[in-house]
Amino acid sequence: MSKFDKVVGYEDIKAELIRICDVVKNPEKYDRLGVHMPRGVMLWGDPGVGKSLMAKCFIEESGCKSFTIRKDKPDGDLVNAICDTFAEAKAEGRAIVFLDDLDKFANEDEKHPDAEEYVAVQAGIDTCKDSDVFVLATANDKYCLPDSLLRSGRFDKVIEMECPKGEEAIKVVKYYLSQKKSLGDIDAVEIARIMSSHSCADLETVVNEAGIYAGFDGRDSITHQDMLRACMRMLFDAPERVTDEINSYAMVTAVHEAGHVVAAELLKQGSVTFVSAGGYIGETGGVTNVFTENNYKKSKEEFDNYIIRKLAGKAATETVIGEIDVGCKADVRQAFQAAEKLVGDLCAYGFDTYESGDASENLRAKKEQLVALEMNKYYQRAKKLVSENREFLDKVTDALLKKRTLTQGEIKRIRDSI
């Protein structure tokens, strides 16, 4: 049984680290091939993805004595500690130096290639070049680190750990649920889709938060509804204070969110993981969560669909209520940003709107005019979509007014009933 079994998911990364770990554990096997031990590996990625856990598993699997360095001392003392630690590791023989949160050794807000902490790390690695010292590091942002430190011969492998997605996210949710007392109605697939691209730490927090809801209500099991409430809190900071009164504001919010749902579902069926029109205090009266495979858009069609989805709430409100939607500020801003990227950076409508360096007033005006023109076209497409699917829109609106929150399955049942 491998020590890496403690880590849920990340099978590709674990396989690579197990292979490297074998070189560290059994150098003689590789010496016969003329292969030398890699000098070091860096794991980097967003906070909470499990970098430190993966590093600890590597150390345990290797069986080597380890020396840990992290920024828990004043700058001057840290430099001395770095030098002393590498010297101790070299004297030990076969050892691992673990640099935890390496990007925090100096000012992590900017790139400081000449920071004395990084110079000390580089010098330490170089002094151990002909020894059996292996260097393992974690970092949130590798781009804060100097290129000279990241080069081969110092860190031969720089591996990104991303937030779990798809099957990996499902495995993580199921793992955390297995440690709690829950009912069998919890759909781990749905929760994983809702929490797509969030860290393992976020997933753990959601499951724990759901347990708090259950405990406070005096129940002995976590339900799917508890999980949805916890997701709402984590993703959108949705407050608990809601009004039970179906007033004009609640109606506008329900229609607005229903517009997002209709557009998203017609453009890509099954893409809405949940929608809520809880009448929350503040500008955000509701939320519609749309599942995407990637955090970036890979085609013009994905840009088009994104913009239409964003404008569909405004389109639905103004179609059904007959008034200007005053709660669509964030939607409009995000839609404009996507349209500006299409027009400018991606030259989707020609190269004459591309900005390279300082743009002239004439170019800016031309670009703004084209963006506005395209945005009007997108808005008309959004209005057409919600108008031609009024029955779907009305049924989602009615369901939101009654239940406030709808899951993917409930949205599917509404659509199938039409």
Model-derived features: where do they sit?
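Walker A/P-loop NTP-binding motif of AAA+ ATPase domains
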Residues: 2-192
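Residue-level signature of catalytic and energy-coupling elements of molecular machines
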Residues: 17, 42, 59, 155, ...
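Active-site phosphate-binding and catalytic loops of NTP-dependent enzymes
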Residues: 25-33, 131-132, 239-245, 266-275, ...
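Soluble catalytic regions of large protease machineries
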Residues: 46, 249-254, 261-418
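Short active-site segment of divalent metal-dependent hydrolases/proteases
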Residues: 103, 258-260
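Short conserved motifs of the RecA-like P-loop NTPase core
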Residues: 107, 182-197, 209, 225-226, ...
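AAA+ ATPase "lid" subdomain C-terminal helix
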Residues: 193-225, 232-240, 261-273, 343-349, ...
